[in-house]
From Swiss-Prot:
This is Glutamyl-tRNA(Gln) amidotransferase subunit E. It catalyses: L-glutamyl-tRNA(Gln) + L-glutamine + ATP + H2O = L-glutaminyl-tRNA(Gln) + L-glutamate + ADP + phosphate + H(+). Allows the formation of correctly charged Gln-tRNA(Gln) through the transamidation of misacylated Glu-tRNA(Gln) in organisms which lack glutaminyl-tRNA synthetase. The reaction takes place in the presence of glutamine and ATP through an activated gamma-phospho-Glu-tRNA(Gln). The GatDE system is specific for glutamate and does not act on aspartate. The keyword Nucleotidyltransferase does not apply. Its EC number is 6.3.5.-. Coiled coil: none annotated. It comes from the Archaea. Belongs to the GatB/GatE family. GatE subfamily. It comes from Archaeoglobus fulgidus (strain ATCC 49558 / DSM 4304 / JCM 9628 / NBRC 100126 / VC-16). Keywords: ATP-binding, Ligase, Nucleotide-binding, Protein biosynthesis. One of its GO terms (molecular function) is aminoacyl-tRNA ligase activity. InterPro entries: Asn/Gln-tRNA_amidoTrfase_suB/E (IPR017959), Asn/Gln-tRNA_Trfase_suB/E_cat (IPR006075), Asn/Gln_amidotransferase (IPR018027), Asn/Gln_tRNA_amidoTrase-B-like (IPR003789), GAD-like_sf (IPR004115), GAD_dom (IPR029351), GatB_C_1 (IPR042114), GatB_Yqey_C_2 (IPR023168). GO terms for cellular component: cytoplasm.
Length: 613
């Protein structure tokens, strides 16, 4: 295990949380997500780089321009000309601003006197404008985790970016449904000193945000960006961590990557390694190749003196230095790169590798990296890889990386600089009034859970306290047993999810409908799960329809139990083969009253239980 204190680990977290407001941040469109198939129109753009007010160019944006990609946008009947950047933005959404101020006060922050909107250059296609609108709302706060105080540097109110739905060679497709949804960005100071603490801080920030009851939930509604550095390493920003469970693993693997890159630097220095500036056209070497991957494509290569055996070296689980180079190539629309540490392979023969080495003048101990595809893209990608290879002689480059599902990371772009920010002239500033500052501070989920522990088991108390339907629980717990209400709101949906039922179709009105039916005695508490299942299948069912269906289902349970008992000899003789004749008897009684699939499911379950005894 690594000694993080000795390594000088510093971690800062940025939480991006979508707010559950009626309208988007700068227009009156609803904050709904849509299916791409529902799009009724599309348009495309090419984005160009704008210099800052003092004439500087942001390095991350500059690299994106070199990729010269076409961006296609999916439009809906719930989006407008503001998202398309064909109309100026409206004023800042006051509802979103009040939520941001509320969160700031919960984090002991100083709220600014006047909120000014800025433009942050982003030309990766995720914003039609070529920039993201962001506004500083508060600064200088803190939160406590395990007795340690972690500083909260800033809280910004931002517009959410577009959702990427496709990435191809030379183009990307984005959906406009998400663009403009209000979100808060909370950035901590780099006070976190271990992977475990990073996870705990992120969990606490998430809990504080959910305590407002005004944030969206579900995959993609909250993202963690993590800034990580070690002594002699560099600050690296890892974007898009959606699963809290792997956050500690991401920190651990990034530290490992930086440690390994520093080891590579020392070894390259000892070898006297250097990077040749020339990009060689080696298409002729592969003119008769059997490799389908590079056949009939322009093939170019670069020479890395003294890098032999190092390009193929693992720096994170399942990822090598060559993978870092391949990540760069992919950002230019290529499939990746090949290098001599892994060749011959991919249909490339040993003889072709030998001719490749001769063509670029490689000696023993050297490595050759090559790419195939469109000539211009290959040239640009290899030029960028030359710069990355040079940095191996220096150490760890500052860059923005993407979180992978296994906790490793991939290259995205250089770390952006200060040149990416400039004022937004279309949106007037907002003066923060005393009335706005007097916003109510809500009860924290952890405090609510402690109250519920008097009514429910500890684990269940936390789940209900953290549920978006906790107010429904409080209301109905005055009329029904709290455990019965908890069963309807949490235990039954959890069981249905395990069965593969789409419980996402359930809304608050459905839970209220079922609870009201239990309260009136229309259905037994045991029938609540079946009622919710039926509502998932048909969300518009009425109480009367549910009562009829569940009544029949309860009748069938009794009938099947009695039938299993009466036909014990048949079951003993034929085992699972008894299903067909038993099914016939049940359907004779219930045909037209209960769905055949439901009958089969219940009978199979009862038969399996009888055979296991």
């Amino acid at each position: 295990m690594m000694d993080y204190k000795k390594l000088g680990l510093k971690v800062g977290i940025e939480i991006h949380q979508q707010l559950d407001t009626k309208h988007k941040l700068f227009c009156l469109c609803p904050t709904l997500t849509r299916e791409v198939e529902e799009s009724n129109f599309e348009f495309f753009r090419y984005l160009r780089l704008k210099r800052s007010e003092i004439g500087e160019e942001d390095r991350a944006a500059k690299e994106e321009v070199e990729r010269s990609r076409r961006f296609i946008y999916k439009y809906y009947d719930t989006t407008c000309l503001v998202e398309a950047d064909e109309e100026p933005p409206r004023e800042v959404n006051r509802e979103a601003l009040l939520i941001a101020i509320q969160v700031a006060k919960m984090l002991n922050m100083e709220v600014v006197d006047e909120v000014h909107v800025m433009r942050k250059i982003v030309i990766d296609g995720s914003n039609t404008t070529g920039f993201q609108r962001t506004a500083l709302v508060a600064f200088g706060g803190f939160l406590e985790v395990d007795g340690k105080r972690v500083g909260v540097a800033t809280l910004c109110l931002e517009e959410e970016a577009c959702r990427k739905v496709e990435d191809g060679e030379g183009y990307a497709v984005y959906s406009l449904d998400r663009l403009g949804i209000p979100l808060v960005e909370i950035g901590t100071e780099p006070d976190i000193d271990s992977p475990e603490m990073a996870k705990k801080v992120a969990a606490r920030l998430g809990m504080i945000l959910r305590s407002t009851g005004k944030v969206k939930r579900g995959l993609g509604t909250i993202r963690q960006d993590v800034n990580i550095s070690i002594r002699d390493g560099a600050r690296v920003e890892i974007k898009g961590v959606q699963e809290l469970d792997i956050l500690d693993k991401i920190v651990e693997y990034e530290v490992l990557r930086q440690v390994n890159l520093l080891k590579i630097r020392e070894e390259l220095k000892q070898r006297g390694a250097r990077v040749e500036e020339k990009v060689f056209d080696v298409t002729d070497v592969f003119s008769n190749t059997k490799s389908k991957i590079i056949r009939n494509k322009t093939v170019k290569a670069i020479l890395l003196r003294g890098f032999g055996g190092i390009v193929g070296r693992e720096i994170q689980p399942g990822r090598r230095l060559g993978t870092e180079f391949a990540d760069i190539a992919k950002t230019y629309g290529l499939g990746g790169v090949f290098h001599t540490d892994e060749l011959p392979a991919y249909g490339i023969s040993e003889e072709e590798v030998s001719r490749l080495r001769d063509a670029v003048g490689a000696e023993d101990g050297d490595a050759v990296v090559m790419a195939a595809g469109d000539a211009v893209r290959v040239e640009r990608a290899l030029r960028r890889i030359i710069e990355r290879a040079k940095h191996c002689l220096v150490g760890v480059p500052e860059e923005t990386r993407k979180a992978n599902e296994d906790g490793t990371t991939s290259y995205l772009r250089p770390l952006p600089g200060a040149a990416r920010m400039y004022p937004e002239t279309d949106v007037p500033p907002v003066v923060v009034t005393e009335e706005m500052l007097n916003v109510e501070i809500p009860e924290l989920i952890e405090e609510r859970a402690r109250r519920y522990e008097k009514l429910l088991p500890k684990d269940l108390a936390w789940e209900i306290a953290d549920s978006p339907y906790y107010r429904v629980f409080e209301e109905y717990s005055e009329k029904l047993q709290p455990t019965v209400v908890a069963r309807v709101l949490y235990l039954a949906p959890a069981a249905l999810r395990r069965e593969g039922v789409e419980i996402e179709r359930l809304e608050e009105r459905h839970y209220r409908l079922v609870l009201d039916m239990v309260l009136r005695g229309d259905i037994a508490k045991e029938g609540a799960e079946e009622a919710l299942k039926l509502l998932c299948q048909n969300p518009e069912m009425s109480a009367g329809q549910l009562k009829e269906k569940i009544g029949a289902a309860e009748d069938i349970d009794g009938f099947i139990a009695k039938l299993i008992e009466e036909k014990a000899d048949l079951i003993a003789e034929r085992g699972e083969g008894a299903f067909k004749p038993l099914m016939g008897l049940v359907m004779k009684e219930f045909r037209g009253k209960v769905d055949g699939k439901v009958v089969a499911e219940k009978l199979k379950k009862a038969l399996k239980s009888a055979l296991s005894q």
